[in-house]
From Swiss-Prot:
CDD domains: ABC_6TM_Pgp_ABCB1_D1_like, ABC_6TM_Pgp_ABCB1_D2_like, ABC_MTABC3_MDL1_MDL2. This is ABC transporter B family member 19. GO terms for biological process: acropetal auxin transport; anthocyanin accumulation in tissues in response to UV light; auxin export across the plasma membrane; auxin polar transport; auxin transport; auxin-activated signaling pathway; basipetal auxin transport; formation of plant organ boundary. The gene is ABCB19. It comes from the Eukaryota. Coiled coil: none annotated. It comes from Arabidopsis thaliana (Mouse-ear cress).
Length: 1252
């Protein structure tokens, strides 16, 4: 995995460079708005226009008031009257702004939430409508989860309040022009002339950022897939000590994202710097001509002030509107990916109106001259002129070598794929012409690897028939021999099964899958190795149940184990893409052809006892009751108690608390900011440089304010020579400030981007490292679903960067501006400054109330969206099951249900936020009115001057904007605080099984002597269900030990405990006489090889999957391991050989091929201890025969633990242990145990023998 993923990560830049910039037209982001949304957007836009226009109107009034100040300095009574009148106008204006800003914020926020909820629904609906081939080639689970969790949030950011914000600033710009033209049209015209330069700088910045954003998203999506794979297959990663491989691959993948972040920082610094620089120089030009016009008598100081200030604020607003372009660019790039899927028309249409329904289905299926290759490997032909007929009501078995195309027959009948040529007919009608939903309603499917969803047992069975009654569900479960073990669970049918059914044994999962298919009561039954995971007792009863349910139905049985199909109506043998033999068992045996050869191969591995089938039912029924029912009930601590609650911590974080493990409760650490700074210590030089840049940027605002206030005073000079001299002086200051702004903004944003990107990368690496340090039991919990964790990994680190790195930059800048402004104000006029200081708490309180209104919703929204990511991830990863059971609408319904919480809360949130924002605006205008009135009062008393009051007032306006901007960052800072808490809850968790324990003894070599001594064990997720009680087992070094017993008896638990996935509650698990808890876990696992029942492969090449077994494996070593596992032959036959990608979770390979690669991986590891959990269950007879010999060679001289349902595969082991009721009830060699006819092993053997 590591090599391929590393290579992929390195090729990302080249691919990204070649890719054309992909972005959606902005208006198309609103494609999912309904009439109410349009009304909300209209009202919100109207509010934004009024709100935006208020500032130029304020300056119009202010300019007239300045004239009242300047022209009435000799008539103090008239001056106070004029100022008081305009102060009242400011209060009225504040009320208008209060209501308009409320409408702007409330309507746009709520509309954005509504539209994105519709987008999420439409996106998942479109994903689920795609044909299965799409998921083989174009979509990975990690990509879908990333889109649902991250891309939709980017779109929401782009179409919510930021649109209102953009309209608001654009209105300020346009209204500024209007007011400017009314006041002094020549100055306004001059202002218009310089705007294109400002717009060009901003547009170039936005264009550059769009390209970088698109590439960055693609790059991180690749990294997210690597993380999701590692977490989803954590048992394989742990077993092969692959944590560092996963981390290295992930690190390599995000390295390119890091470099793109640096570029984005430079682009932002240069973009904003140039925008403000050009704006400053433009203001200098306007100021110069304003002085000329005043001296020529073409205007006065008040009108010039109004025109200039309107132009300046208009220009600044244009620049501020550009700050939203970054969010729009990200939204467009994310929207493109979403809309690409939404608009993609699947090859196989699911539309109910597309196709016809048959009045009656008999079930005759015919393949006529079918040629087929998988879309992912079009050059590898599976079928050539393939012909086969499945008669109505008959059972036909399809057999052949692993990879011969048996399961492909099932996929084509289900219409997961369409043939390249030829026809597939149902009752003489080509299935392409039938409605897809109708077709699949007639078919019941049980796969080789059962796919369950992370919900209750009841809900999983109900996928077969959503409207089924409880009686029907229990009948289906009883028929599948599942009812007995389900009813013994504390919560029965309401028990949660965990992600992919991880809380159940393989047999239990398969029985639930069979119950699901039986509930459907289909006309056609497709059984793809449906009983392969069952123990002898369960298989016997389930096989009888299947025999009953098969009566009267067209049944297609795909089988490796030929003993299960001897009584079918017909058997078809597939070789090299064609049917080479058909007939009954007896007919084919008599031919001594391909089928007879397969039988001989299977007999070589020990299945020789073909008793009279007529005795099967009576004997199995009698014998099934002799086994303890309890032993069938629970695997591994099977199912967890799903009970959990939500609570709000003291710091406002929403927490999910498992009742089974309350000690896991986490809160955002109180000192998280200090810890985050410490975590960021390697970037201190960059942080300091960024801080210096922020401080330098912070001086720009006060400098502008001071020069501006001085210019107002200059406009009332009666000495025109002094006016000209001073104007020239201030113009040069503005030009210098423009050049200064470019450097200051570049230093600020570039260095803070380096700090932020490095912090994000480090946090992501540390989080994944911490996640992969947790014990396996942690991953068994619902809240640690792989899709949820992958989404958390993607968003939390980005939120930390946004809230901390990026926002520290703005806060430092604004705080510098605030401090500088107040120092200047107190020096100029301390009385007015004191009043300003007195009004600030009112302004801050209003904004703080807004912050509090937002704080309570972050947790709810994040939690609900995380759950939607989990549902989407499950739906995609189990897409074949979803498609086969027409469960798209059910998945979509669950998805929409989880979206209701944020939708309901968003209404209240938007209203509250809008109201409090409006209140803060009213406080601002009220404060300004009070200050101006008080200033006029001081002037009238002779204790201050017109110049001082205006200077302090202008400083107030600039400072208030800085405070407002700082406080407006509250939502992002709150979200970042939540994310920091989430990050540290992951980093701080103390794993219960530390793989890197410094005090543990390193393991250089082991003999392989294993002992379980008085072990009590229950799974952490279900501590009340004991798997082992006083369990004792000794396995001598170099010997082979088989473990048998009923499904759920705890066989796989032995292997899990040897791997130390879990620790015992009491007693010891010892290797070479040492408690394994005292041994270094990673060095111990290097000595152990594991092959699981369901092989876990990574989305890499075949070569990399095998090489995963040994660091630095050579090509010859990989090929030798593949030969030993009987995999070299089929691998060599592929066009790309060992470089063939296996697809996500090995989807491009058959079950047998996947298992052989997994075995080759274990062979390459060359372990001292070998753990085989049904290692050959997925193989056909020929492959199993060769592979069994390879395994026997591999087992020589090694301690081997074999978990087996098929007793024929373990007759040659040194010792066999029978597990029942949490203990070893019988132990000995095959011959010794067979000599005890009433023993547990003999009963199991009789069951298995007589089912044949």
């Amino acid at each position: 995995m590591s090599e391929t993923n590393t290579t992929d990560a390195k090729t990302v830049p080249a691919e990204a460079e070649k890719k054309k910039e992909q972005s959606l037209p902005f208006f198309k982001l609103f494609s999912f708005a309904d009439k109410f949304d349009y009304l909300l957007m209209f009202v919100g836009s109207l509010g934004a226009i009024v709100h935006g226009s208020s500032m130029p109107v304020f300056f119009l009034l202010f300019g007239q008031m300045v004239n009242g100040f300047g022209k009435n300095q000799m008539d103090l009574h008239q001056m106070v009257h004029e100022v008081s009148r305009y102060s009242l106008y400011f209060v009225y204006l504040g009320l208008v702004v209060c209501f308009s800003s409320y409408a702007e914020i409330a309507c746009w926020m709520y509309s954005g939430e509504r539209q994105v909820a519709a987008l999420r629904k439409k996106y998942l609906e479109a994903v689920l409508k795609q044909d299965v081939g799409f998921f083989d080639t174009d979509a990975r689970t990690g990509d879908i989860v990333f889109s649902v969790s991250t891309d939709t949030l980017l779109v929401q950011d782009a179409i919510s309040e930021k649109v209102g914000n953009f309209i608001h600033y654009l209105s300020t710009f346009l209204a500024g022009l209007v007011v400017g033209f009314v006041s002094a049209w020549k100055l306004a015209l001059l202002s218009v002339a310089v705007i294109p330069g400002i717009a060009f700088a901003g547009g170039l910045y936005a264009y550059t950022l769009t390209g970088i954003t698109s590439k960055s998203r693609e790059s991180y999506a690749n990294a997210g897939v690597i993380a999701e794979q590692a977490i989803a297959q954590v048992r394989t990663v742990y077993s092969y000590v692959g944590e560092s491989k996963a981390l290295n691959a992930y690190s390599d993948a995000i390295q390119y994202t890091l470099k793109l972040g640096y570029k984005a920082g430079m682009a932002k610094g240069l973009g904003l710097g140039c925008t403000y620089g050009i704006a400053c120089m433009s203001w200098a030009l306007v100021f110069w001509y304003a002085g000329v016009f005043i001296r020529n008598g073409q205007t006065d100081g008040g009108k010039a002030f109004t025109a200039i200030f309107s132009a300046i604020v208009g220009g600044m607003s244009l620049g501020q509107s550009f700050s939203n372009l970054g969010a729009f660019s990200k939204g467009k790039a994310a929207g493109y990916k979403l809309m690409e899927i939404i608009n993609q028309r699947p090859t196989i249409i699911q539309d109910p109106l597309d196709g016809k329904c048959l009045d009656q289905v008999h079930g005759n299926i015919e393949f006529k001259d079918v040629t087929f290759s998988y879309p992912s490997r079009p050059d590898v032909m599976i079928f050539r002129n393939f012909n086969i007929f499945f008669p109505s009501g008959k059972t036909v078995a399809v057999v052949g070598g692993s990879g011969s195309g048996k399961s492909t027959v099932v996929s084509l009948i289900e219409r997961f794929y369409d043939p390249n040529s030829g026809q597939i007919l149902l009752d003489g009608v080509e299935i392409k012409t039938l409605q897809l939903k109708f077709l699949r309603e007639q078919i019941g499917l049980v796969n080789q690897e059962p796919a369950l969803f992370a919900t209750t047992i009841l809900e999983n069975i109900l996928y077969g028939k959503p409207d089924a009654t409880m009686v029907e569900v229990e009948a289906a479960a009883s028929a599948a021999n599942a009812h007995s073990f389900i009813t013994l669970l504390p919560k029965g049918y309401d028990t949660q099964v965990g992600e992919r059914g991880v809380q159940l044994s393989g047999g239990q999962k398969q029985r639930i899958a069979i119950a699901r298919a039986m509930l459907k009561d289909p006309k056609i039954l497709l059984l793809d190795e449906a009983t392969s995971a069952l123990d002898a007792s369960s298989e016997s009863i389930v096989q009888e149940a299947l025999d009953r349910v098969m009566v009267g139905r067209t049944t297609v049985v795909v089988a490796h184990r030929l003993c299960t199909i001897r009584n079918v109506d017909s058997i078809a043998v597939i070789q090299q893409g064609q049917v080479v033999e058909t007939g009954t068992h007896e007919e084919l045996i008599a031919k001594s052809g391909a089928y007879a050869s397969l039988i001989r191969f299977q007999e070589m591995v020990g299945t020789r006892d073909f008793s009279n089938p007529s005795t099967r039912r009576t004997r199995s029924t009698r014998l099934s009751h002799s086994l303890s029912t309890k032993s069938l009930s629970l695997r591994s601590g099977s199912l967890r108690n799903l009970s959990y609650s939500y609570s709000t911590g003291a710091d406002g974080r929403i927490e999910m608390i498992s009742n089974a493990e309350t000690d896991r409760k986490t809160r955002a650490p109180e000192n998280y900011f200090y810890r985050l700074l410490k975590l960021n210590s390697p970037e201190w030089p960059y942080s300091i440089m960024g801080a210096v840049g922020s401080i330098l940027s912070g001086f720009i605002g006060p400098t502008f304010a001071i020069v501006m206030s001085n210019m107002i005073e200059v406009f009332y000079y009666t000495d025109y020579d002094s006016m000209e001299r001073k104007t020239k002086e201030y113009v040069f200051i503005y030009i210098g400030a423009g050049l200064y702004a470019v450097g200051a903004y570049l230093i600020q944003h570039y260095f803070f981007s380096i700090m932020g990107e490095n912090l994000t990368t480090r946090v992501r690496r540390m989080m994944l490292s911490a996640i992969l340090r947790n014990e396996v039991g942690w991953f068994d919990e619902d809240e640690h679903n792989s899709s949820l964790i992958a989404a958390r990994l993607a968003t939390d680190a980005a939120d930390v960067k946004s809230a901390i790195a990026e926002r520290i930059s703005v806060i430092l800048q604004n705080m510098t501006s605030l401090l500088t402004s107040f120092i200047v104000a107190f020096i100029v006029e301390w009385r007015v400054s004191l009043l300003i200081l007195g009004t600030f708490p009112l302004l801050v309180l209003a904004n703080f109330a807004q912050q509090l209104s937002l704080k309570g919703f972050a947790g709810d929204t994040a939690k609900a969206h995380a759950k939607t990511s989990m549902i989407a991830g499950e739906g995609v990863s189990n897409i074949r099951t979803v498609a086969a059971f027409n469960a798209q609408s059910k998945i979509l319904s669950l998805f929409c249900h989880e979206l209701r919480v944020p939708q309901k809360r968003s209404l209240y949130r938007s209203q509250t936020s809008g109201f409090l924002f409006g209140l803060s605006q009213l406080a601002l205008y009220g404060s300004e009115a009070l200050i101006l009135w008080y200033g006029a009062h001081l002037v009238s008393k002779g204790v201050s001057t017109f110049s001082k009051v205006i200077k302090v007032f202008v400083v107030l306006v600039i400072t208030a904007n800085s405070v407002a901007e700082t406080v407006s960052l509250a939502p992002e800072i709150i979200r970042g605080g939540e994310a920091v808490g989430s990050v540290f809850s992951v980093l701080d968790r103390q794993t219960r099984i530390d793989p890197d324990d410094a005090d543990a003894d390193p393991v250089e070599t082991i003999r392989g002597d294993i002992e379980f001594r008085h072990v009590d064990f229950a799974y952490p997720s279900r501590p009340d269900v004991m798997v082992f009680r006083d369990f004792n087992l000794r396995i001598r070094a170099g010997h082979s030990q088989a473990l048998v017993g009923a499904s759920g008896s705890g066989k796989s638990s032995v292997i899990a405990m040897i791997e130390r996935f879990y620790d015992p509650l009491a007693g010891k698990v010892m290797i070479d006489g040492k408690d394994i808890r005292r041994l270094n876990l990673k060095s111990l696992r290097l000595k152990i090889g594991l092959v699981q029942q369901e092989p876990a492969l990574f989305a890499a090449t075949i070569f990399d999957n095998i090489a995963y077994g040994k660091d630095g494996a050579t090509e010859s070593e990989v090929i030798d391991a593949a030969r030993a596992a009987n995999a070299h032959g089929f691998i060599s036959g592929l066009p790309e050989g060992y470089k063939t990608p296996v697809g996500e979770r090995g989807v491009q390979l058959s079950g047998g091929q996947k298992q052989r690669i997994a075995i080759a991986r274990a062979v390459l590891k060359n372990p001292t201890v070998l753990l085989l959990d049904e290692a050959t269950s997925a193989l056909d007879a020929e492959s199993e025969c060769v592979l069994q010999e390879a395994l026997e060679r591999l087992m020589r001289g090694r301690t081997t633990v074999v978990v087996a349902h098929r007793l024929s595969t373990i007759r040659g082991v040194d010792c066999i242990g029978v597990i029942q009721d949490g203990r070893i009830v019988e132990q000995g060699s095959h011959s010794e145990l067979v000599s005890r006819p009433e023993g547990a092993y003999s009963r199991l053997l009789q069951l298995q023998t007589h089912r044949i």
